[in-house]
Amino acid sequence: EQGYITALVKEKHTFGAEGAKVNVSFSVEEKDRHYIEKVKIVGNDKTRDNVIRRQLTFYPGEKLDTEKIRDGQRRLSNTGYFDMESGMPAGINFEQGSTADRQNIVVDVKEGRTGMLRFGGGYGANVGAFGDISYTDRNFDVMDMPKSWEDFMQGNAFRGAGEILTLRFSPGFERTEIMVSLTNPAVFDSPYSAGVSLFNFLRWYEVYEEQSLGSRVSVGREIQRDFFVRLSPELNLIDIDRRDDKEDTPQDVLDVKGGHLKAGVTLSATMKKTDNVFAPTKGYEGESSVEVAGLDVDIAKYKFQTTKYNTLFEIPKWGKHVISYGGTFGVVESTSGQEVPIFERFYAGGYGSLRGFRYRGVSPVDSKTGDQVGGDVLIVIKPNGCGIGN
C-alpha cells in the first residue's frame, strides 16, 4: 500500500540444538518506492475513457497503492459495462515508466453487452400471474445518435456514456407497471447524479384498487466511496377505488376513495460496501430515507433498512453458500391531524419481506371486515440463505 511493490527476500535455515528441528527465517529488504506515472485505458471500443477513469481510485503522481488498484478494479467490474463471462472484465497490468521508480498502470477492459431486452412472464406470490417486456442499458449515451440504420442495429449508437436507461411494460392480473427512466450517475464526471422517471402503476389489492400515475426527478451526490445522498421530488396522481368483488369494504378504503394529488420529496442516504453489486458474498448495505408530502396526501415517513452478507462455505465448481440477514424499520405519521391514508401505511409478508406469510398478510385488520388495513410502524428482522454461483 505504500508503493513498495518489489522486495528482496532471503531465506535462512539454522538447525536446532536438540532433535530434528530446523529454524527457518526470512529477511525482507524493500526496494525503492514506486509511483504512478500514467494510467492507460485499453480495450474500450465503445465506453468513453472518462467513464472508466471516474471509477478508478488511483491517479498519476501518487504512490503505487495496490489496495487502491484492487478497489478500482472492483468498482469497474461492478459497473456492468464489461464482459463478466470473460473471468477478467477489467484487468490491471504494470508497465515500466520513464524511470526505475515509475510505473504505468494499464487498465485492460473487455467490452460486454450492456443492453438487455427481456421477454418473459411467470407467477409470483406477491404479484400473481404477469408478463414482462423490458429493456435496460447500463452504458447508455443519449447524445450518441446513430449515423445510419445499420449503425443502430449493430449496437454502435447510444453507447458508452455510462447512463442507465430502463423501459418496462409489465402487465398482470394483480399488477401492471409501465415505467421509463434515465439516470446519469456522474453528471459532467462530477460526484453528482441526476435522473428522471415517468411511471404508471396499477395494483389490485385484496381490499382496494390503486392507480398511481406520476413522475420523479432525482439529484444525488457521492459523498465518499460507496456512500450516496439523494434528493427526489415527486408528483403523483393516486386513484383509489373499492373492489367490485368485495361485499364489505373497510371504512379506511371508503375514506380515501377517489383521486389524490400528492407532491412530495424524499431525502435518502445509501451505503453499499459489498464485494459484488449483482451477487454479493460479503459486506453490507443500508439505506435510510425521509419523505415529506403535501397537497392531498399530508404525511411524513421515515424508513431504514440494512442487509449483511456472509459466506458460510464454498464448494469447488458449485460456488458459495451465502447467508444474508438484516432488518427494516419504518414509521409514518399524518401532518394534517387526520389518519394516515391506507395506501401510505406499512405492511409485511411475502417475498422480500417475511417468508411464510402471504403478501401483505402481516398487518392490523379492520375490526368489522377482518381485512388488512396496514399500520403506522414497521419492524422486520429476517435471515435469508441463498446460493451464489461465484
Q: Each predicted region: which residue ranges?
A:
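Glycine- and acidic-rich phosphate- and metal-coordinating loops
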Residues: 106-110, 166, 195-199, 285-289, ...
